[in-house]
Amino acid sequence: MKNIRHIYYVSENTGLLAKDSGKSLLCQFPGVEFQEELLPFIRTKDDAQRTINAIREKCGEEKPIIFSTIFDPEINKILQHEDVILLNICEPFLTQLEGMLGKNALRASGHSRNVDQQIMSNRVDAIHYTISHDDGTAIMDYEEADLIIVGVSRSGKTPISVFLATQMGIKTANYPLVEQDLTFCQLPEDIIKNKHKVVGLSISPDVLHTFREQRYKGSHYAQMSTCKRETLQSKRIFEKYDLPVVFSDARSIEETATQVAQELSKQWNPIF
């Protein structure tokens, strides 16, 4: 019989921080099998008591591991039961901050929810903007963008833009280089005047050909010669305007989006 360790992620909110942090630690133990469960929205002492009772009943004599991001000391006191191992992810850092700042932390529930609500509001705005400015739509509104991704058609601009909006709250417009741009090696004026927000997205002709063939098989648009010409011209445009460039080949959407965000940071932050 396999030795499986039960893992619980508990939080007063969604529990995503507890889960992400816990998983980052657990992945350092590849030889151990874990059974994980997310228990969000534990906001009262009654919630905590019901939670700990259910965990103890399910795990029996085994000591399960609980990753927590709960601040409330009364709730933590209930969760700190002798039959479980409680790892509060925030507490060590909170204690350090108290020492450095010379002040006691509130350790009160609800404050992080206010932050979460603001983050959610920002992300909703970013998503709305990004969807409304996909594929060169409403280019005259690029002043409001946090980021403008430029690249040839089917290079991955839309999924990367959506990821940046939903996960990072970045208002992202994306613009496809059309035939006129490629022929004259010229960007539209609305992009040029927002050049400090622009990141070029590059892709190899082979990968671009594969993507286009999947959707428009046998078309001139998908031909290798077309893909080679467009990727070469896009490279010339990026060089002409001295734009930062991210290569999307052999990377996941998450990896490419993160690198795009890093390039944006370099544009804004002189330290980088």
Curated annotation (Swiss-Prot):
ADP binds at residues 151-158. Its EC number is 2.7.11.33, 2.7.4.28. One of its GO terms (molecular function) is protein serine/threonine kinase activity. The lineage of its organism: Bacteria, Pseudomonadati, Thermodesulfobacteriota, Desulfobulbia, Desulfobulbales. It catalyses: [pyruvate, water dikinase] + ADP = [pyruvate, water dikinase]-phosphate + AMP + H(+); [pyruvate, water dikinase]-phosphate + phosphate + H(+) = [pyruvate, water dikinase] + diphosphate. The keyword Nucleotide-binding applies. This is Putative phosphoenolpyruvate synthase regulatory protein. Bifunctional serine/threonine kinase and phosphorylase involved in the regulation of the phosphoenolpyruvate synthase (PEPS) by catalyzing its phosphorylation/dephosphorylation. Belongs to the pyruvate, phosphate/water dikinase regulatory protein family. PSRP subfamily. It is an enzyme of class 2 (transferase). The keyword Cell inner membrane does not apply. Keywords: Kinase, Nucleotide-binding, Serine/threonine-protein kinase, Transferase. It holds the Pfam family Kinase-PPPase. InterPro entries: Kinase-pyrophosphorylase, PSRP.
